[in-house]
A protein has these predicted regions:
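C-terminal structural segment of proteins
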Residues: 1-248
C-alpha cells in the first residue's frame, strides 16, 4: 500500500476506484490477506455510510455498518428475531465483528460468507453508486466491476427467517451455511460455503429438503461434495422444522 485517501464524496471515491491498482477498503479484515499490490486504498468511513436506519417499510444498512451492528440492532431483532445474531455470532469474535463491514461482506461475494447467505433469503436490494438499486439475487450474478455499494435495503414484509450453519469449531469457517425464509407459503432457501458463494432458490415448506439437492456442492479441506450435499438436506430439514414451529 502506497497511498491512503479518505474522500469527501462518493463521486471522488468512485473516480479513484476506477484505477485497477486502487482498492476500496471496508474493515480490512480480508483485504490484508491478499497478495496483490495496492497503490491507493480508499476509505469510505467519512461519508456517513456506517448507519442502520429504519422506516415503516424497510431497513437501510450502510455499507460501512459493522457485523456487530447487525448482531445488536434492536429494530432488526424486533423484525427478524435472532436471525442476524445467528448469522454473525460464529464469525471469529466481537472484536473482529466490530471491524468487518456489511458492504465488504456482500460486495466481496465470498464463498464462505454467512452474511451473503442470510441476506439472500430476505427481500434485499443493493444500492450501487452508478447502477442504482438492484435485487441482491441479481447482484451476485453480475460481473465484478468498479462500482461502489452504498447500502443494502431490506424490506419489512413480515417474512419469518431462520439461519443455520455447520462448523468444525465455533468460530471456524463454515463447512456449509443455510438460511430460509417463509412468507405466504413461499420459501426462499439459500445455501453457501458449498464451497462457493451462496445462491438462492424458491420452494415450499414441503419441498425444502428436495430443493437443497438442486444446489451444486464441491469439495475442499473441510469436506467433500457428497458430505456437503448430505448436510444441505439436514440443514434444510432443520430450517423447515423451525419455520413450521415458529422457532425463529
Amino acid at each position: 500500500m502506497k497511498n491512503y485517501v479518505k474522500p469527501g464524496t462518493l463521486e471522488e471515491a468512485y473516480e479513484l476506484n476506477q484505477k485497477r491498482a486502487n482498492r476500496i477498503i471496508g474493515g480490512m479484515m480480508w483485504i490484508r490477506m491478499g497478495r496483490g499490490n495496492v497503490n491507493t486504498v480508499i476509505d469510505l468511513s467519512g461519508l456517513g455510510l456506517d448507519q442502520i436506519t429504519e422506516t415503516e417499510t424497510e431497513f437501510h444498512i450502510g455499507c460501512m455498518s459493522t457485523l456487530h451492528q447487525l448482531e445488536t440492532h434492536s429494530g432488526l431483532k424486533e423484525t427478524f428475531g435472532d436471525f442476524f445474531k445467528e448469522c454473525t455470532r460464529h464469525i471469529v469474535g466481537v472484536q473482529f465483528r466490530n471491524g468487518a463491514t456489511v458492504g465488504g461482506s456482500i460486495f466481496g461475494r465470498y464463498g464462505f460468507s454467512d452474511i451473503l447467505t442470510a441476506f439472500l433469503v430476505l427481500d434485499t436490494k443493493v444500492k450501487l453508486y452508478k447502477k442504482g438499486i438492484v435485487p441482491l439475487s441479481e447482484f451476485i450474478r453480475m460481473d465484478r466491476d468498479r462500482d461502489i455499494l452504498e447500502e443494502l435495503i431490506v424490506a419489512k414484509d413480515g417474512r419469518k427467517a431462520v439461519y443455520l450453519s455447520e462448523r468444525r469449531s465455533q468460530t471456524d469457517f463454515p463447512v456449509l451455511t443455510c438460511a430460509a425464509s417463509e412468507k405466504d407459503g413461499t420459501v426462499l432457501l439459500s445455501i453457501g460455503a458449498r464451497p462457493m458463494k451462496a445462491d438462492v432458490t424458491e420452494t415450499t415448506l414441503d419441498e425444502m429438503e428436495q430443493a437443497a439437492d438442486t444446489f451444486t456442492y464441491g469439495s475442499n479441506m473441510r469436506g467433500s461434495g457428497e458430505y456437503r450435499k448430505h448436510l444441505g438436506r439436514v440443514l434444510a430439514g432443520r430450517a423447515k422444522k423451525a419455520l413450521e414451529e415458529g422457532n425463529v
